[in-house]
Amino acid sequence: MEKGIISDQKIWRVRPEWPFLLFLVFVVAAYLGLLLLLVGANMLTVSWSQASEILKDADIQHSITLTFVTCTATAILSVLVSVPVGYLLSRYQFRGRALVDTFLDIPILLPPLIVGLSLLILFNRIPPSACCGMLAGGALIAAIWGAARKGNGIVIQFLVGSAILFGLLSFVFAGSQRSLEGIVSEVGFPMTFHPLGVVLAQFPVAAAFAVRTMRTTFDQISPRYEEVAMTLGCNRGQAFMRVVLPLAGKGIVAAGTMAWARALGEFGPILIFAGATRGRTEVLATSVFLEINIGNLPGAAALSLLMILLAVSTLLIVRCLAGRGGAV
Amino acid sequence: MSGGILVLEQVTVQAGDFVLSPFSLEIREGECVALMGPSGCGKTTLLETVCGLREGPVGGRVVLDGLEVKNLPPGARGIGLVPQDVVLFPSLTVREQIEFGPKLHGWKPEEIKERVESLARDLGLEGLLSRLPEGLSGGEARRVALGRALALRPQLLCLDEALSGLDEARHDEVLGVIRKMIEREGVTALHVTHSKKEAEAIADRVVVMD
C-alpha cells in the first residue's frame, strides 16, 4: 500500500446524508406550499380592476388610514410601556417576579376575543368605585405580601400609597352610578365603539409582544455596562439612559414593529369593543369581515392581500434589524 | 488596622451559594497590591465588593480613605475600575469614553479637554480619539479602559485581570503602560491576577487569597 493513501478497509462506513436532508426539505416545502396556496387563493379570487375599485372606495380608504393611525399609536404606546417593564424584568430579581412575568403573558395566551369582552364589561358594567376598590385591594395584597417577605421598602411604600389613593377614590366614586365609559367620555376620550377604543383593543396583546422583545433585548445587553457606568458616577437611571438605551435602539425599533404588526392583525377585541362601523371604527381587519358579510369575496381577498403585504414588510424590517447585529 | 487608603477588615460576602471567608487587607497610599489566588477563591467578588457592585450581604468593614463605604453607591466611592472584559461603551468614541466620568461630575469643558488630551498622550491614544471601540485592538481597548478609569483621578484603581486574553507582545506592552500610569498618576492600585509573573512585574506587594 502506498504511504498516505487509506485503504478501503480503513474508511469507516457512514450512512448517507440525503434521507435526512430530504425529510427537512419535504417538511419545509409542505409548510411553505400551504402558505403559498393561502396567498395564491386570494390572488386568484381578485382581479386588478376589482382590487383597484375597492381601494378607491371612500370607506375603505378611511379604514386604511385608521389602520395606520391606530397601529402606529398602539406601537408607540407599547414601546413606552415595554421599555421600562422589559428592563425591570431583565435586571431586577424580586419576589413575585415569576408571577408578574406570567401575568404579563396573559394577553398572549388568552383568545383575543376575551380581551375585547373584558374591555367592554370594564368600561360599561363596572362602576368606577369597584375599579378603584379592585386596584386598592391588589396593591394592598402586593404590599402585605412584599412586607411579609422583607421586600424593597420603597416599593412597599409605593404600593401602600397606591392602595390608600385608590381606596379614597373608591369612596369618592361610591355614590356615582356612572360607568367608566361615562367618565372618560365626559373628559373627551370616549372609548367604546369609538376610534380611540380601537387603540385600547389593540394595545394589550401588542404590548405583551413588545414586552417580550424588550426583555430579550435587555437580557442580551451585559449588565457590566451599567456597572462600569456606575463606578464612573452614574446612578441606575443615568446608566440606563446614557449607556443601556443607546444599545437597545434596534431592539426598541423591533419591539415597535412587532407591536405594529400585532395591532394590524387584531380583530376580535376591536369588533367587540370598538365595533365595525363603516367610516368610523372600521380598520382593515374588520373591513375584510364586513366585505365577507356583504358577499364581496373579491373585495375581502384584495384587502387580505394588502394586509399580507403590510405584515410581510413589517416582518422583513424586524429580520433586517436582527440581521444587522442589533440586540433583537 | 488603620492608616491605609483601603482597609478591609474581616470582609465576608455572600453571593448565591458562594461565601467569601473573612478577609482582611490594608493598602497604603500610592501602593500597588496584586491579589492572587486560585480560580473561584473570590478575588473578583472581593474586588466588586470594594467597588460596590455586589448586591447581597457584606460583612466586616470596607474603609476607603478613613470612610466606611459599604453603604455608598459605586459612583460615590472614588474608585476607577478596569474590568476583565474591558466593557467599553459601544456607541461612544474613545474621547467620549474618557470624558464620560468628568462630564457626569460636571467638570468644566476646558478641564475635560485638558485631562482627555493629557491621558491620551500618556496612553498613546492620540490618534484614536475619534474611533469607536469596534475598531480598536485588544491592547488599545485596554488602554482606553485604563484612561476612562483614571480620568476622574480616583483614589483607588481596581484592575480585574485587565491583561487576560492578550497575546504576549500586547500583554507586556499594556503591562508597561499600566505600571507607568500608576506611577505617573500616583494612584493606589489593587490588581487582581492569575499570573505570578504579572503580579511581580506590576505590584509593590503580592497578597495571596486561599
Whereabouts are the PLM-identified features?
Chain B
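Conserved ABC ATPase signature
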Residues: 132-136, 140
